[in-house]
């Protein structure tokens, strides 16, 4: 094929791709590199057949995560049943080790969901640092959590392992901020990427449907 013919075909293909992206943008369909990004090397997921893994990378220290929480909670009440949602606390800003351990300790006691908003409020509304064991224990006791059991879980070896694994997962995903949502170990979106909290969650819904459809 002559260079001129090849250039014409390449230009046509590029134009076609551009028109496809424009059409997708106009009808509200999420567009890669605009509403979400693809993870260069997809990460393994352990979900049952027919389910889609969705991970929220977050930190209790992050003000944007705090702001996102109410929108996320509303979405969780109505998400598609095939979506298997889980949270993954990441090392972020000051006190990150404690915040990761707080989440995983609560998770081990079956209290993570019930305490999620309360911990966020403690940090961003009450401005508690939660950086000393006695302060953490007192906060948990005030909220109906057995302080002795909680601190045992907080200091457990397994909690440290989970915290390290969460940090590795975040690093391997290629995410560069929180809150970020990872879908099936293949895609990332966020309120920043999708330009809005609800748009990010709508993008998650769309990506989950694509995964279910085998795309």
Where are the model-predicted features located?
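Extracytoplasmic/secreted proteins, especially bacterial periplasmic and envelope-associated proteins
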Residues: 53-56, 67, 71, 97-101, ...
């Amino acid at each position: 094929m002559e260079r001129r013919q090849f250039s014409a075909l390449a230009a046509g293909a590029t134009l076609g791709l551009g028109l496809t992206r424009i059409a997708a943008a106009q009808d509200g369909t999420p567009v890669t590199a605009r509403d979400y990004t693809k993870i260069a090397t997809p990460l393994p997921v352990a979900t049952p057949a027919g389910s889609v893994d969705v991970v929220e990378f977050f930190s209790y220290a992050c003000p944007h995560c705090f702001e996102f929480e109410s929108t996320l909670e509303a979405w969780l009440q109505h998400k598609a049943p095939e979506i298997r949602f889980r949270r993954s606390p990441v090392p972020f800003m000051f006190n990150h080790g404690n915040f990761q351990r707080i989440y995983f300790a609560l998770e081990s006691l079956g209290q993570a969901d019930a305490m999620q908003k309360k911990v966020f409020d403690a940090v961003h509304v009450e401005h508690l640092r939660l950086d000393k064991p006695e302060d953490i224990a007192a906060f948990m006791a005030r909220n109906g959590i057995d302080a002795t059991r909680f601190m045992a879980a907080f200091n457990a070896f397994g909690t440290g392992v989970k915290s390290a694994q969460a940090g590795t997962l975040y690093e391997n995903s290629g995410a560069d901020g929180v809150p970020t949502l990872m879908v099936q170990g293949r895609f990332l979106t966020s309120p920043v990427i999708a330009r809005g909290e609800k748009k990010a969650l709508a993008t998650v819904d769309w990506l989950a449907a694509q995964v279910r459809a085998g795309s």
